[in-house]
């Protein structure tokens, strides 16, 4: 489930920020607006509050405005997540189950989904600042934080910090910006003979 939350946080960060320092907000907004699509390989680590690694994942992701996400983690923890702006499908081949969520509900619960979301209303609950070559997006009440780092105007590192101190770090490699990605990439066909849990 941590992979689901983090991937959905990815699917929100392309858009408009409504709080925080105005110059930091505008700078981050400008960087994010330049990105209409993004494809990359990733390495993800989940760490506890002491920095101990709890989980390591790798895979590929694709993002496309306005709200499309494809996220595929490799074995041994293989999973696939597809979001099309309305629904999110999370497929775990090991347990042979597909869970379907309403994407708007995921946006409300996850700061990372702010990257793609074209509705700036969610940003009213976040502050944005820039220091140490990173943008920090912090929820005003629940303490969750999102850190975004860009290299040559490409998003290359994302860290999500939960209020209790757990960190999820995502390093992006072989980043390709604004290449054509077919809408078919964001269509999920439920495999035969799997359980479906529709929470949408």
Curated annotation (Swiss-Prot):
GO CC, any one term: outer membrane-bounded periplasmic space
Signal peptide: 1-18
Domain of life: Bacteria
Record-level GO BP terms: lipoprotein localization to outer membrane; lipoprotein transport
Localisation per UniProt entry: Periplasm
Key word Magnesium present: no
InterPro entries named among the record's database cross-references: LolA/LolB/LppX (IPR029046), OM_lipoprot_carrier_LolA-like (IPR004564), OM_lipoprot_carrier_LolA_Pbac (IPR018323)
Pfam families: LolA (PF03548)
UniProt entry keywords in alphabetical sequence: Chaperone, Periplasm, Protein transport, Signal, Transport
Membrane-crossing residue ranges in chain numbering: none
Functional summary from the UniProt entry: Participates in the translocation of lipoproteins from the inner membrane to the outer membrane. Only forms a complex with a lipoprotein if the residue after the N-terminal Cys is not an aspartate (The Asp acts as a targeting signal to indicate that the lipoprotein should stay in the inner membrane).
Family classification: Belongs to the LolA family.
Subunit structure, as described in the record: Monomer.
Protein name: Outer-membrane lipoprotein carrier protein
Lineage of the species this protein comes from: Bacteria, Pseudomonadati, Pseudomonadota, Gammaproteobacteria, Alteromonadales
Gene: lolA
């Amino acid at each position: 489930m941590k992979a689901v939350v983090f991937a959905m946080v990815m699917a929100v960060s392309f858009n408009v920020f409504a709080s925080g320092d105005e110059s930091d907000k505008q700078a981050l907004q400008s960087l994010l607006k330049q990105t209409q699509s993004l494809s990359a390989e990733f390495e993800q680590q989940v760490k506890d509050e002491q920095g101990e690694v709890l989980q390591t994942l790798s895979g590929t992701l694709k993002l496309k405005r306005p709200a499309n996400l494809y996220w595929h983690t490799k074995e041994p923890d293989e999973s696939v997540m597809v979001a099309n702006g309305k629904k999110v499908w999370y497929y775990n081949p090991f347990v042979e189950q597909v869970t379907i969520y309403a994407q708007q509900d995921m946006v409300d619960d996850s700061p990372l989904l702010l990257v793609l979301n074209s509705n700036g209303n969610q940003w009213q609950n976040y502050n944005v600042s820039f220091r140490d070559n990173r943008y920090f997006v912090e929820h005003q009440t629940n303490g969750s934080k999102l850190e975004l780092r860009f290299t040559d105007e490409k998003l290359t590192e994302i860290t999500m910090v939960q209020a209790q101190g757990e960190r999820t770090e995502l390093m992006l490699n072989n980043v390709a910006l604004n290449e054509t990605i077919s809408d078919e990439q964001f269509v999920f066909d439920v495999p035969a003979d799997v359980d479906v849990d529709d929470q949408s």
